[in-house]
Amino acid sequence: MMLPSYLHFAIRKKVLAIFIVLLIISAYLGFAPALPVPINDKVCHFFVFFLLTLVFYWVFDLSRRRATQLTILVCGVFGGLGSEFVQSFLTYRTFDLFDIVANLLGCSLALLLNILYHKRRLEKIRLQRYGHVPTIADDLEMQASAAEEEEEGEEDVSKSTP
């Protein structure tokens, strides 16, 4: 059976390994009865989901739109919301709406940074591949400079002829 074309993508193995290590550390921090270091719970939620989202976005070699959609689904919905619902079933952890807010803020900031960097990276690759492609504004500037050069040439000719 052939897979649809949108399911053909590469996995960046080194990034996946980093993500798995971060996920194991996050799971330990999220489901441990008490944190080993005294830290604000909301700050911890923010940074954990910021890092997870920052790394997960680059695990699969996808277009910017597909990477964004997959990251929102996995990190935002399953990670940010799902982990809090799982904690509500644990006897030593409690459900906290502000934890979800911190999770989603961390995801959102990392996703925004990833999107901006991805867009910039694609533009740089496009410029390297195709060079500078003139736009309408560039074309108008070239026409104006050509007209100025033509006028200067006519002035030079009129000055040289008596």
From Swiss-Prot:
Presence of keyword Transmembrane: yes
Gene Ontology cellular-component terms listed: Golgi apparatus; membrane
Topological category with respect to the lipid bilayer: Multi-pass membrane protein
Keyword annotations of the record: Membrane, Transmembrane, Transmembrane helix
Domain of life: Eukaryota
Signal peptide: none
Location of this chain's protein in the cell: Membrane
Membrane spanning stretches: 15-35, 43-63, 70-90, 97-117
Name under which the protein is recorded: Uncharacterized protein C11E3.10
Organism encoding this protein: Schizosaccharomyces pombe (strain 972 / ATCC 24843) (Fission yeast)
